[in-house]
Amino acid sequence: MTATAAVLLDAEAHPVIAHRGASAFAPENTLVGFERAAAFGAEAFELDVHVTADDQPVVIHDPTLDRTTDRRGVVRLMPYAAFRDADAGARFTTDRGATFPFQGLGVRVPLLAEVLGMFAETPFIVEIKAVAAAQAVKRVITESGAMSRCVVASFDERALAPFDAPPWIRSASRAETLSLLSRALVGRAARPSRYRALAIPTRFNGIPIPMRMLAGAARRIGCPTHVWVIDSPEVAMSLWKQGVAGVITNRPGAMLAARDAGAAE
């Protein structure tokens, strides 16, 4: 059976989506982090993509290597070969720097193609972090045969423009999300949209999002709402009760346990 993004497009489902992998337990946006998420039973993965100087989409959140590896430099200005062997486990710690359990273990910044290939049955939210990466991401998803299981996301509508037409699946940009919310606040119906899901934080510019209202407006046009980053089981349960579909979390095991316990009550 061909894997699809169905669980990410069903407003009635409550998927647990691993944020950059199981990033409370392993380095974010790495193969080992995604392996840990799979072991916990996460039903989809969220990841971030930048593009290198030689047009290779790589899975990393920041525009630079500085925070998550033992190297420094701007990803967009370097060919992948220049940092292929950077240690992406060097800075990961769960005890405020007392230990670095993944340092020196060969953890690397992976190519998007590697992640899609290794987890060929997993749905993904692929967040494009820079407009310059959009075409390269489109190429790699196409070459990987992963179009049906990827929801492409970005804050920037320009990065999403290449994914507007079917069979591509994309989420709402920040501007589209705010437009949906503003119309809901004044009781106006949503306009026809090119997006098929929302992927949002709990706050915009420090202001709490009226989640029940926004999720309800999205559901009326057939769009599920996925919320990040949720690491509290109590918050996850509250969001699900407000009509949110998925939670994007660093702790997929805890969220799955909370969801399943709630379903059994």
Indicate residue ranges for each PLM-predicted region:
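Metal-dependent phosphodiesterase/phospholipase catalytic core, i.e.
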Residues: 2-8, 13-14, 61-167, 191-221
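Conserved N-terminal beta1-alpha1 strand-loop-helix module at the mouth
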Residues: 10-61, 66-71, 163
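Hydrophobic faces of well-ordered beta-strands that scaffold small-molecule active sites
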Residues: 16-19, 45-47, 124-126, 150-153, ...
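Glycine-rich beta-to-alpha transition loops that act as phosphate-gripper elements at the mouths
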Residues: 20-21, 28-30, 154, 174-176, ...
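Solvent-exposed polar/charged
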Residues: 39, 43, 117-118, 241
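Alpha-helix capping/helix-boundary segments
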Residues: 51, 133, 158-159, 235, ...
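Hydrophobic packing residues within well-ordered alpha-helices of enzyme cores
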Residues: 55, 137, 160-163, 239, ...
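C-terminal active-site rim and adjoining tail of enzyme catalytic domains
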Residues: 102-105, 174-175, 181-265
